[in-house]
UniProtKB/Swiss-Prot annotation:
Residues 142-308 form the JmjC domain. Keywords: Acetylation, Chromatin regulator, Dioxygenase, Iron, Metal-binding, Nucleus, Oxidoreductase, Phosphoprotein, Repeat, Transcription, Transcription regulation, Ubl conjugation, Zinc, Zinc-finger. This is Lysine-specific demethylase 4A. The modification N-acetylalanine is found at A2. InterPro entries: EPHD, JmjC_dom, JMJD2A_ePHD, JmjN, KDM4-like_Tudor, Tudor, Tudor_KDM4A_rpt1, Tudor_KDM4A_rpt2. The gene is KDM4A. GO terms for molecular function: histone H3K36me2/H3K36me3 demethylase activity; histone H3K9me2/H3K9me3 demethylase activity; histone H4K20me2 reader activity; zinc ion binding. The keyword Lipoprotein does not apply. It comes from the Eukaryota.
């Protein structure tokens, strides 16, 4: 049968089917038939129903239907790679939505053919964000319609509701989607890799793109290459439905795809593991849901689910395996069922069509589910506009990531149109019979003098008239730019409701000004503002949320020391104060420089393009004398005392430093840049990194931490080669050590061909005998260096982290082109080494959070423990300074001090403020964790919440046991028991005599650093309501401001001499 299936639709093109009314009556059987013709190989198929079939007589009576949570789709990105964010809007009716969709602002542009409209879509994707009425619970089918009724398809997926009484909205109940021009659905497969059906009730067409399931892994690899940050945070990040990749990019990287246009009155069927995306041509209404066949069961068992959110859709496969694969049930439960999926095979129900040339006589609806699979499943009752609700409805299909923002985003001007090449496929007509099938295809945030920017933080609208002098970096002529990233700023003070999501963190590099030179930098805006929505609390701390990396609250541990025998420590208040002082100093400089414009006509003396022989006497005399050397007090800098570039060269110290770094995970001088991130996010390094004691001097292979995207992405173009040189098939690379300086690197990180990876290998600097050359982009020696394009040298890690630095030969990782680095970067002062050097040197990077001006050299930041992590296209590295690390820091459980009875602590009183109190008793309370049948979970249930057994008497259920849980709404839901968690509880007594029982997370010791939210609400108990009722604070009297007559009007009128005397 495998050989037969391979001959079916070998080109994996999207197929279109025209069933007769008789053929149309049996849904499950017809799905089996189209798979027997190979339709599933494309991942998408179109079915045109008979002309006499109508799901609804008229759509004139739906204008009052409410769209409860419309979303505005903000898209950021460029060059065919985009990320889509959703801003939740207030509820509206279909009538109101139609009026908006057909308005001049949102209506479909004029076009002569589909290819022209497609080009306009991809070019204007980032402008004028449209509104999508998505995920509206309900159906537009009339009650009497039985054929292909999306509300009751009667497939084996209905077993979920039959067995457990659970409905998952949008999965086994229908959803309505009201679209307008440019509303999109990003690349994704269905939840649990299910089938889906989509019917376009009325309105403008909908365009679909599809990648065949057998090539789905290739699309995933491409997406992970362009979005490594999201991929590291969640293996299945495409399920977030946020990633848009244009067909031009797919074609460029050889990803097979097809496209088709769905007209009103047509069905689209997506198949398991079929990646699809698309957009709406204008106002329309579609209805969809998921379904399953027996072929899906294997996909469901192996589906890779989203790991960053526990409320994503998850369906227990137990009932399906037990019923349809009983012979493999025990093997599957033991985790030994390692079946390899063949994407070319049709569903088992299609066997009859592979043996016959014509369809046998049709059976009635009672036989729709083959082999009586659905015996006992009854039709549910549905109203015209109401959803069929089960008795126990718990969850929804998905929670869209939204920002609740009341303001409208202003419409922007469209960029000039460009052509988008697309393939054409021949279309052949065929009769309505089933046998013949018709294949169809239809910049730097500078706070110094020299750069000034207008402040958009107080406005939600960004006018493109103000950005007319912004010129994006030119790309290669053969790769036409499809869209430019839209730079938006949302007023933090106007954000109403909860802020759930924020957009991209950084702005892509661009040349500002009207000139054509890429090095020219001038603008009227204060900073390069990222596309993000920021919430600002009472304390003024800027909080940036990012769904792709979890919930945005970065959990950060102590910075790790990279000296042998040293231990991790927390930063002292003095060090944090220094960072804060630097930040305030930068803000003062920023305020002073506002409005000033100075030409950058002269290169800074420390710019790498300045020839080495032109160094002034000033610079050569920077080396400190022994009397001038101060004793190093900061722990992170003590091992580096002999490595600062203002000290005399010390090759032995460099060698010792390199040897020390080689013994610490990840054992690569280049990968060290992401060391802090991996320790914080992943609790250290996985087994692929190995232990220092286990590493042999040579031939050890480990997995590099740096994605290939970090070497290929630059701010200068989009001609990217995502090849992975010198990487093995399992993603590992050999570690090599220089026999002269002992620096250790991955062959892939440094560009070492396998033939040269030997014990006699030497790094580029040692091979050139340039032992006294230092990195021109930082202040430290040691590490892995490569030659720059001006005969100077740079750290590979510095070149990776600085967006504008470019590897000329990507495979060899050299030379490094530093000529495109903006000059203002070289004026930034590193907060770590500015007190250790007399002059500014090197090139700094800045914190990626909002407008934070904190700057540091890459090597200094890496040594001090600043968290740097891979970012998504078109950026490279996302950097979090200590200032932004602290507010989001969740106290590590292991770092919490033990508390004893009688100890004075700080806790929250019932009045909402924090007071000192005393611990009077310690108790232990047990909480249960369960996973509900709809995929949701709870980890703070009391034992008495389990109603299926008496847990107080008999103890907790066995792990994995099915239980019944009484929820806070009084309903009882099915769930599986996960674990019981004994939690230490503390009974505290306040000075007013009141007592509370709290968890350890809600208690703070007196010597513990308090979060700002606690500091702002910390009070002292007193008998008086107002402490200062009888005392007054000394008020510092300021000199009265002198009143001066406006000189412009001094001579315009006559005033009395007395009045003039008073005024002056």
């Amino acid at each position: 049968m495998a050989s037969e299936s391979e001959t079916l639709n070998p080109s994996a093109r999207i197929m279109t089917f025209y069933p007769t009314m008789e053929e149309f009556r049996n849904f499950s059987r017809y799905i089996a038939y189209i798979e027997s013709q190979g339709a599933h190989r494309a991942g998408l198929a179109k079915v045109v129903p008979p002309k006499e079939w109508k799901p609804r007589a008229s759509y004139d009576d739906i204008d009052d239907l409410v769209i409860p949570a419309p979303i505005q789709q903000l898209v950021t990105g460029q060059s065919g790679l985009f990320t889509q964010y959703n801003i939740q809007k207030k509820a509206m009716t279909v009538r109101e939505f139609r009026k908006i969709a057909n308005s001049d602002k949102y209506c479909t542009p004029r076009y002569s053919e589909f290819e022209e409209l497609e080009r306009k879509y991809w070019k204007n994707l980032t402008f004028n964000p449209p509104i999508y009425g998505a995920d509206v619970n309900g159906t537009l089918y009339e009650k009497h319609v039985d054929e292909w009724n999306i509300g009751r398809l009667r497939t084996i997926l209905d077993l979920v509701e039959k067995e457990s009484g659970i409905t998952i909205e949008g999965v086994n109940t229908p959803y309505l989607y009201f679209g307008m021009w440019k509303t999109s659905f990003a690349w994704h497969t269905e939840d649990m890799d299910l089938y889906s059906i989509n019917y376009l009730h009325f309105g403008e067409p909908k365009s679909w793109y599809s990648v065949p399931p057998e090539h789905g892994k290739r699309l995933e690899r491409l997406a992970k290459g362009f979005f490594p940050g999201s991929a590291q945070s969640c293996e299945a990040f495409l399920r977030h439905k946020m990633t848009l990749i244009s067909p031009l990019m797919l074609k460029k990287y050889g990803i097979p795809f097809d496209k088709v246009t769905q007209e009103a009155g047509e069905f689209m069927i997506t198949f398991p593991y079929g990646y699809h995306a698309g957009f709406n041509h204008g106002f329309n209404c579609a209805e969809s849901t998921n379904f399953a066949t027996r072929r899906w069961i294997e996909y469901g068992k192996q589906a890779v689910l989203c790991s960053c959110r526990k409320d994503m859709v998850k369906i227990s496969m137990d009932v399906f395996v037990r019923k349809f694969q009983p012979e493999r049930y025990k093997l599957w439960k033991a985790g030994k069922d390692n079946t390899v999926i063949d994407h070319t095979l049709p569903t088992p129900e299609a066997a009859e069509f592979l043996k016959e040339s014509e369809l046998p006589p049709r059976a009635g609806n009672e036989e729709e589910c083959p082999e009586d699979d659905m015996e006992g499943v009854e039709d549910g009752e549905e109203g015209d506009l109401k959803t069929s609700l089960a008795k126990h409805r718990i969850g929804t299909k998905r929670h869209r990531v939204c920002l609740e923002i009341p303001q409208e985003v202003s419409q922007s001007e469209l960029f000039p149109k460009e052509d988008l090449s697309s393939e054409q496929y021949e279309m052949t007509e065929c009769p309505a019979a089933l046998a013949p099938v018709r294949p169809t295809h239809s910049s730097v945030r500078q706070v110094e003098d020299g750069l000034t920017f207008p402040d958009y933080s107080d406005s939600t609208e960004v006018k493109f008239e103000e950005l007319k002098n912004v010129k994006l970096e030119e790309e290669d002529e053969e790769e036409e730019q499809e869209a430019a990233a839209l730079d938006l700023s949302v007023n933090p003070a106007s954000v109403g409701g909860r802020l759930v999501f924020s957009g991209s963190k950084k702005k892509s590099s661009s040349s500002l000004g009207s000139g054509s030179s890429r090095d020219s930098v001038s603008s009227d805006s204060e900073t390069s503002e990222p596309l993000s929505c920021r919430a600002q609390g009472q304390t003024g701390v800027l909080t940036v949320h990012s769904y792709a990396k979890g919930d945005g609250r970065v959990t950060v541990g102590e910075p790790c020391m990279r000296k042998k025998g040293s231990t991790a420590r927390s930063f002292s208040e003095r060090e944090l104060a220094e960072v804060a002082d630097e930040y305030m100093f930068s803000l003062e400089e920023n305020k002073k420089s506002k409005g000033r414009r100075q030409p950058l006509s002269k290169l800074p003396r420390h710019h790498p393009l300045v020839l080495q022989e032109c160094v002034s006497d000033d610079e050569t005399s920077e080396q400190l004398t022994p009397e001038e050397e101060a004793e190093e007090t900061e722990a992170w800098a003590k091992p580096l005392s002999q490595l600062w570039q203002n000290r005399p060269p010390n090759f032995e110290a460099e060698k010792e430093f390199n040897e020390t770094m080689a013994q610490q995970a990840p054992h690569c001088a280049v990968c060290m840049i992401f060391q802090t991130y991996h320790q914080v996010e992943f609790g250290g390094f996985n087994q692929n990194c190995g232990n220092a004691s286990d590493l042999a001097p040579q031939k050890q292979r480990t997995k590099p931490l740096i994605p290939e995207m970090c070497f290929t992405s630059t701010g200068c173009g989009t001609d990217i080669n995502l090849s992975t040189p010198y990487l093995e098939e399992d993603g590992t690379s050999i570690l090599v050590s220089c026999k002269k300086c002992s620096v250790r690197v991955h062959a892939s990180c440094y560009g070492v061909p396998p033939a040269k990876a030997s014990e006699d290998w030497m790094c580029s600097r040692c091979s050139a005998n340039a032992l006294e050359e230092d990195c021109c982009l930082c202040s430290l020696r040691g590490g892995a260096l490569q030659r720059a394009n001006d005969d100077r040298w740079v750290h590979v890690s510095c070149a990776v982290a600085i967006l504008e630095a470019r590897f000329v030969n990507i495979a060899e990782r050299s030379p490094v082109d530093v000529s495109k680095i903006p000059l203002p970067r070289f004026k930034l002062k590193c907060i770590f080494c500015k007190k250790r050097r007399k002059r500014t040197a090197g090139c700094c990077v800045q914190c990626s959070h909002g407008r934070c001006p904190t700057a540091f050299h890459v090597s200094c930041a890496q040594a001090a423990g600043v968290m740097m992590q891979p970012d998504d296209w078109p950026f490279v590295v996302f950097i979090t300074c200590f200032r932004h690390k602290i507010p989001n820091l969740e106290r590590a459980k292991g770092a919490l001090q033990s508390i004893t009875a009688g100890q004075k602590v700080i806790s929250k009183h019932k009045n909402g403020r924090f007071y000192q109190c005393e611990v009077v008793r310690l108790t232990t309370e047990t909480f249960y964790e369960v996973n509900f049948d709809d995929g949701s979970f709870s980890d703070n249930l009391y034992p008495e919440d389990i109603v299926s057994q008496d847990c107080l008497q008999f103890g907790p259920p066995a792990e994995g046991e099915v239980v019944q849980v009484r929820w806070t709404d009084g309903q009882v839901y099915g769930a599986k028991f996960v674990a019981s968690h004994p939690i230490q509880m503390y009974q505290v007594e306040f000075e007013d005599g009141s007592q509370l029982v709290v968890k350890r997370d809600d208690v703070y010791t007196l010597d513990e650093e308090l979060p700002k939210r606690v500091k702002s609400r910390l009070s002292v108990a007193s008998d008086m309501r107002f402490n200062e009722i009888f005392t007054e604070k000394e008020v510092k009297q300021e000199k009265k401001r002198q009143r001066v007559i406006n000189s412009r009007y001094r001579e315009d009128y006559i005033e009395s001499a007395l009045y003039r005397a008073i005024m002056e």
